[in-house]
């Protein structure tokens, strides 16, 4: 006759977990380091392919290409009530859209999910909006993959860009007044010194350790176009 199997007491589970945390040596600030790029790099992955895992299905790529072609640049906006300091500077992106259009490329707006169902500030942009990107992750990823380049601010859907092979530039990697976007946080939890890139990023992928002001975004774009 088999004996009943009971889970270990909660105190034992907690003790084992704490023993592991103390044993690893790479962890800082208790459990929070589990969620950091620094922990993942040290304990599991040294090769880039492990993190560049997001890809769009073939049928989604075909749908997006038929609708938008491939001569476009996406702009993923953030317009959220949570930590509004991290939101996109719409004035900057107005100018960016005009500049992109002057280069013969189509700017495609990917709105913030919350904003899409509330204030809809993205309508101020007066450029094509990829409505399908709001509810279909495959189509959103296909938009990124088919694009000449992808522009965004940190947060929101930017992890899709970070964990893919598509070309991108993510602005506001640091934001004054937001602890999780501070240089200290990136150094302590992601192993990044100011201005550095994540170890698995490609040449065509950039983190901008500055605000998305008109001057900064335009300077980055002009440099990007000059080096194409």
What are these regions (language model features)?
Residues 1-10, 17-20, 119-132, 185-188:
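Active-site regions of enzymes building and remodeling cell-envelope glycoconjugates
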Residues 6-74, 79:
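A nucleotide-sugar donor-handling region in carbohydrate enzymes
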Residues 73-81, 90-137:
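Catalytic donor nucleotide-activated moiety binding site of glycosyltransferases and closely related
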Residues 78-82, 114-116, 156-158, 174-177:
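Short, solvent-exposed loop/turn segments at secondary-structure junctions
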Residues 99, 142-143, 160-163:
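Hydrophobic/aromatic ligand-binding patch that stacks against planar heteroaromatic rings
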Residues 145-151:
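Acidic donor-binding loop of glycosyltransferase active sites
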Residues 159-228:
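Nucleotide-sugar donor-binding patch of glycosyltransferase catalytic domains
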């Amino acid at each position: 006759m088999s004996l009943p199997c009971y889970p270990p007491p909660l105190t034992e589970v907690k003790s084992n977990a704490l023993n592991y945390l103390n044993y690893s040596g790479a962890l800082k600030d208790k459990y929070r380091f589990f969620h950091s790029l620094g922990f993942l790099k040290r304990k599991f992955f040294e090769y880039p392919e492990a993190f560049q895992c997001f890809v769009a299905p073939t049928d989604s790529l075909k749908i997006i290409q038929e609708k938008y072609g491939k001569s476009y640049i996406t702009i993923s906006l953030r317009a959220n009530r949570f930590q509004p300091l991290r939101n996109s500077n719409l004035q900057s992106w107005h100018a960016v859209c005009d500049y992109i259009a002057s280069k013969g490329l189509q700017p495609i707006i990917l709105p913030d999910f919350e904003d899409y169902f509330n204030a809809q500030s993205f309508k101020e942009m007066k450029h094509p909006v990829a409505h399908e990107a709001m509810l279909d992750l495959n189509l959103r990823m296909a938009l990124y993959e088919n694009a000449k380049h992808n522009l965004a601010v940190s947060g929101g859907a930017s992890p899709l860009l970070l964990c893919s092979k598509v070309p991108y530039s993510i602005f506001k990697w640091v934001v004054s007044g937001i602890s999780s976007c501070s240089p200290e946080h990136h150094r302590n939890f992601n192993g990044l010194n100011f201005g550095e890139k994540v170890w698995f990023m490609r040449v065509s992928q950039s983190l901008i350790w500055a605000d998305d002001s008109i001057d900064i975004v335009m300077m980055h774009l002009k440099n990007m176009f000059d080096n194409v």
